[in-house]
Amino acid sequence: MNGGIDLQGSFIDTLKDLGLPPGVAKVIWMPLPMILMIIGATVGVLVVVWLERKISAAAQQRIGPEYAGPLGVLQPVADGLKLVFKEDVVPAKADPWLFTLGPVLVVLPVFVSYLIVPFGQNLVITDLNVGIFLWISLSSIAPIGLLMSGYASNNKYSLLGGLRAAAQSISYEIPLALSVLAIAMMSNSLSTIDIVDQQSGYGILGWNIWRQPVGFLIFWIAALAECERLPFDLPEAEEEIVAGYQTEYAGMKFGLFYVGSYVNLVLSALVFAVLYLGGWEFPVPLDSLAGWLGVSPDSAWLQVITASLGITMMLLKAYFLIFIAVLLRWTVPRVRIDQLLDLGWKFLLPVSLVNLLLTAALKLAFPVAFGG
């Protein structure tokens, strides 16, 4: 297997060749992955917002954004600037500390979760042995922020919206975790790198989506509910309880909720690609293709091509899933709160438990195919 390109080693060696001490070179490298991660996630959100507006406009036979830049590509930037310069209003009877902390608790864990998303063999900020467990743990913090925002607003509609959001997130967190546990059982690891490696070698035929068809459906439904996407956007739907926990928010605090929702959608799509679609792996194994062409897997230019294709494949898979999520917005009607909770507790939870037990049985019966 191609070991991948070592960006950290190449960067530090380049700085050492320029005369910098090794310690200084490492200090310069340390913040760069985090900065790239924040910039990449922000740009990804801007692209998703623009795509959703254009796709939604096409579904309604409209033009969509077209004046802010060519084809309206700068419309999300204009929206962000508008929110930045709006007045930040705090209700007179609200708790100012909790009111401010709520949006931060919603957004910050999502950005931190990008630490474990791999775009290649060595293209990951932190390859933890419990990477997927860390993602699930961080996603469990968001309901606290939502409930805090609803409570701190001192508004009955905000409080009810916050309670609904917390109940929805908790209801779908358990089926999500159980579907991920089935993947971890097959991969014998919670590391995102190991999960992708377990799917490599056979191209598209080795992806987990074929061995976990029920698990991938559970994961995708639960991920949409976690991101509060239609048809699961009850906590913030205008037709429901005013605007939910966001009712009293304005300016950049409201913008944090807006950004957090889309950043979480992109993150969920990337994690889905890692768990079920082979991550950065190409549908045809590149190592086998290089062997057929007589190219050495250790050649530098092949490593660069492999890394570039890996990043491209991850983004293509993620944005295809986001495209599906946007289409669902204009296809599936919004469910009622009782239907939403029944789906999570009475259907997805027992099905995810059965799927986990079935995966364990298949692993014992067919260890080669199911990672015994």
From Swiss-Prot:
Residues spanning the membrane: 31-51, 97-117, 130-150, 176-196, 204-224, 254-274, 308-328, 347-367
UniProt KW NADP keyword: yes
Gene Ontology cellular-component annotations: plasma membrane-derived thylakoid membrane
Keywords, alphabetical: Membrane, NAD, NADP, Plastoquinone, Quinone, Thylakoid, Translocase, Transmembrane, Transmembrane helix
Cell compartments where the protein resides: Cellular thylakoid membrane
GO biological processes: aerobic respiration; photosynthesis, light reaction
Keyword Thylakoid: yes
Alphabetical list of InterPro entries matching this protein: NADH_UbQ_OxRdtase_su1/FPO, NADH_UbQ_OxRdtase_su1_CS
The protein's role, per its UniProt record: NDH-1 shuttles electrons from an unknown electron donor, via FMN and iron-sulfur (Fe-S) centers, to quinones in the respiratory and/or the photosynthetic chain. The immediate electron acceptor for the enzyme in this species is believed to be plastoquinone. Couples the redox reaction to proton translocation, and thus conserves the redox energy in a proton gradient.
Name of the protein this chain belongs to: NAD(P)H-quinone oxidoreductase subunit 1
